[in-house]
């Protein structure tokens, strides 16, 4: 399959809710879905990401892939795909995000990280690559990833969740980088890793 360009903040596909992946009466999934899923894994891996939503590569369908440790610093990772995810979370704290504990990045905002308030626990239900029901649940980094990727599919970037000085810093970063306009992307493997992995 292939590594494909990742869309950058400002591309309309990132700011529009995605469409559910059609499921046949017999539970079958579209014939072209395995190729899309493989492209997503290839692209996420080339970018050293922990997750990638379909709209980040320009496909407005409701699915994401992940390769994420349960908590920061762990080397054991969970890897898979969720089709048509539905998110459930604990309450999001109303305090300012901690600059050390709550830092978050995004492949569609390459090289930037900002503290982002998220729920401590999250669960996603949906379908796996075979169309079988799947439930993923986690805390810490895994919960953050579930919320981040599902947010993409709802048409939001983590920048939309930022508050106070973090929101102002993100707005300046978008302007400084010339982002916020349609048509921008970057190609993992062809440019230096924007996060320095």
UniProtKB/Swiss-Prot annotation:
UniProt-listed Gene3D superfamilies: Peptide deformylase
Textual note on the cofactor: Binds 1 Fe(2+) ion.
Catalysed reactions, semicolon-separated: N-terminal N-formyl-L-methionyl-[peptide] + H2O = N-terminal L-methionyl-[peptide] + formate
Entry superkingdom: Bacteria
Pfam family, one: Pep_deformylase
GO biological process: co-translational protein modification; translation
EC number: 3.5.1.88
Top-level enzyme category: hydrolase
Keywords for this protein: Hydrolase, Iron, Metal-binding, Protein biosynthesis
Required co-factors: Fe(2+)
Family label: Belongs to the polypeptide deformylase family.
Protein purpose: Removes the formyl group from the N-terminal Met of newly synthesized proteins. Requires at least a dipeptide for an efficient rate of reaction. N-terminal L-methionine is a prerequisite for activity but the enzyme has broad specificity at other positions.
Protein name: Peptide deformylase
Organism the protein comes from: Mycolicibacterium smegmatis (strain ATCC 700084 / mc(2)155) (Mycobacterium smegmatis)
Upper taxonomic lineage: Bacteria, Bacillati, Actinomycetota, Actinomycetes, Mycobacteriales
Gene assigned in the entry: def
